[in-house]
């Protein structure tokens, strides 16, 4: 598309002016890149690693593709593409030692790799996602380096249909036990989990709620929820949930002053609480309180 071409031209211009020392390294420090990297605030990353790509020429091609991708995609998406290319690189190193660059790729190599992925224990449980990500980054390399022979080598028919995941459903007794358990963790962690349940959102959406998220409109209380990829949306909430959110805001402001996020990072008040912190607190408490589901397994 025209937008993609314009982005590619801008990328090549930025690449010319970039910090050459950083983008030639095998491990990039995100803070040293001269572009704004979009990433999940509750799962922050500090580096991007290209180690594990065995072929030097391929590694350099992938670096340029990643530098381009970081302009338009989230860091999490790019890291998943890197996982796919590292796995492909290992296969090439073991079975196609003469292949050094994307310029050497052809349909036969891809077909043989797809068979290998289906028949060998490659360590991935998400075949469809892996192939989709591999296609994405290989096509970008083909565009940047003008390798027409390497473009669209992975076909639509190579990618199996998406299979919907089954969500775990908790019984009323399990939910009752879990909610009783929340009374035994620290108050702000309990509020995170309760608000998360009542909103019915992803945990990342709850952890990035802002202190100005509540508003009134036509007699209703609305909450504004920010998402990394879709900016924000608003939805009505109950008086009870609004009261709980206000308590969480008051707790934060009494301890840390005015903050951007309700559940602020205690070490950096410009950022939200991290997912790993919440996960660690809840997991520790689950084992301490011996909290189990109806089948006797830990929650």
List each model region and its residues:
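Basic, alpha-helical nucleic-acid-contacting "clamp/cap" segments
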Residues: 131, 135-145, 217, 226-272, ...
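Short, basic/aromatic-rich helical patch in the C-terminal catalytic core of site-specific tyrosine
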Residues: 134, 206, 299
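A cross-kingdom feature marking solvent-exposed beta-strand/loop segments within repeated
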Residues: 1, 94-126, 156-165, 176-180, ...
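Basic, Lys/Arg- and aromatic-enriched nucleic-acid-binding interface segment
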Residues: 173-203, 293-294, 298
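Short helix-capping and inter-helix turn/linker motifs at the boundaries of alpha-helical repeat units
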Residues: 56-57, 104, 168-169, 182-186, ...
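Active-site-adjacent "gating/activation" loops or surface patches in catalytic cores
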Residues: 150-175, 256-259, 269-298
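Charge-rich, intrinsically disordered N-terminal extensions
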Residues: 1-154, 181-184, 194-195
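Short, charged phosphate-coordinating catalytic segments
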Residues: 145, 195-217
């Amino acid at each position: 598309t025209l937008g993609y071409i314009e982005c590619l031209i801008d990328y090549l211009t930025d690449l010319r002016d970039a910090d050459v020392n950083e983008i030639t390294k095998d491990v990039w420090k995100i803070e040293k890149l001269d572009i704004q990297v979009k990433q999940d605030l509750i799962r922050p990353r500090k580096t991007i690693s290209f180690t594990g790509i065995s072929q030097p020429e391929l590694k350099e091609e992938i670096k340029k593709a990643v530098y381009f991708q970081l302009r338009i995609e989230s860091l999490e998406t790019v890291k998943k593409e890197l996982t796919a290319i590292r796995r492909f690189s290992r296969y090439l190193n073991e079975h196609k030692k003469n292949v050094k660059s994307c310029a050497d790729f052809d349909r036969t190599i891809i077909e043989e790799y797809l068979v290998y992925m289906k028949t060998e224990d490659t360590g991935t449980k998400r075949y469809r996602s892996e192939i989709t990500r591999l296609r994405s980054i290989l096509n970008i390399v083909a565009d940047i380096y003008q390798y027409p022979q390497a473009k669209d080598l992975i076909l639509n028919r190579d990618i199996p249909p998406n299979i919907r995941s089954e969500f775990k459903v908790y019984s009323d007794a399990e939910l009752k036990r879990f909610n009783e358990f929340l009374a035994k963790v620290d108050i702000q962690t309990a509020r995170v989990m309760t608000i998360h349940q009542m909103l019915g959102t992803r945990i990342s959406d709850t952890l990035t709620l802002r202190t100005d998220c509540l508003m009134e409109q036509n007699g209703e209380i609305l909450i504004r929820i920010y998402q990394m990829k879709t900016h924000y949306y608003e939805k009505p909430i109950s008086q009870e949930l609004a009261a709980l959110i206000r308590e969480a805001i008051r707790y934060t402001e009494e301890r840390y002053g005015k903050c951007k996020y309700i559940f602020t990072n205690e070490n950096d008040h410009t950022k939200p609480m991290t997912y790993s912190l919440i996960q660690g607190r809840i997991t520790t408490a689950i084992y301490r309180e011996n909290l189990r589901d109806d089948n006797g397994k830990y929650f």
